A protein has these predicted regions:
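Non-globular, low-confidence helical/coil segments that flank catalytic cores
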Residues: 1-192
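Mature, structured domains enriched in cysteine- and short glycine motifs
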Residues: 185-238
Length: 238
């Protein structure tokens, strides 16, 4: 390892501390990315940072978004950037790319139709676990992929996915799967205030607000102290 590129967003978890310790142990160069900069990796590659935010309130909004260009081929790596960040990037950059790694594991917090239409991808790679508790990839995202006419590839179905390119064409070591158009994720609530088909646990407030726009109280099954930053018994309120 020679370089470690980070968003600069500080975490307090053991995992984050362990990562920083590993970087130090390996003697790698720690580098905090900045919006618009070009990362130097190889003279034949152009890697531009389209988004990063060390001061983001939501960890996902701190995501580093990269556009990797090799000759005539472009690949967009979006991290967990949500639809608001997608809109910001559309106003500043040409995001058109042959390949995109769908944001946030195929969550409906990312991969808006407007964004995918601007990207004009030939292939969309969805990275998510089989039978995950979040319901990824969400039906809205599958609909959007189908609408723009891209082929979808799934790590849950194919495992590790490798893209090989000479800079003009590319091959993928997996078979595309049908991102069938389906009904939008249901958001009706039962008597306990729990949205049907919603995950019980959410990794961040952006995801939670897709189902619970006003957040949840401490009595709700989806309440988590880490989302209640002001300790008022209500998580992810606006």
């Amino acid at each position: 390892m020679y370089n470690f590129i980070d968003s600069g967003k500080v975490h307090t978890t053991d995992t984050y501390v362990n990562v920083l310790n590993a970087v130090k142990k390996e003697g790698a160069n720690y580098h905090q990315a900045t919006i618009g900069e070009l990362l130097s990796v190889d003279s034949s590659l152009k890697i531009q940072v389209l988004h990063v935010d060390a001061n983001a309130d939501d960890n996902n909004d701190a995501s580093i978004v990269l556009k990797v260009s090799y000759r005539d081929m472009d690949t967009l790596l979006t991290g967990d950037a949500d639809t608001n960040i997608e809109s910001q990037m559309l106003q500043k950059y040409n995001v058109e790319s042959e390949i995109i790694k769908a944001g946030h594991h195929g969550s409906n917090t990312s991969s808006s139709l407007a964004f995918l239409r601007a990207v004009k991808p030939e292939a969309v790679i969805l990275s998510y676990g089989k039978g995950n508790s979040y319901g990824h990839p969400h039906s809205e995202v599958k609909n959007n992929i189908k609408t723009v006419g891209a082929k979808a590839y799934s790590t849950a179905k194919s495992g590790n996915i490798v893209v090989t390119s000479d800079g003009y064409t590319f091959t993928i070591n997996a078979k595309p799967f049908e991102a069938n158009a389906t009904s939008p994720t249901q958001t009706s609530k039962n008597q306990s205030g729990v949205v049907s088909r919603a995950p019980i646990k959410f990794s961040n407030c952006t995801e939670m607000r897709k189902y619970y726009p006003n957040g949840v109280s401490s009595s709700h099954p989806s309440y988590d102290e880490k989302h209640d930053r002001d300790n008022d018994g209500w998580a992810c309120e606006k």
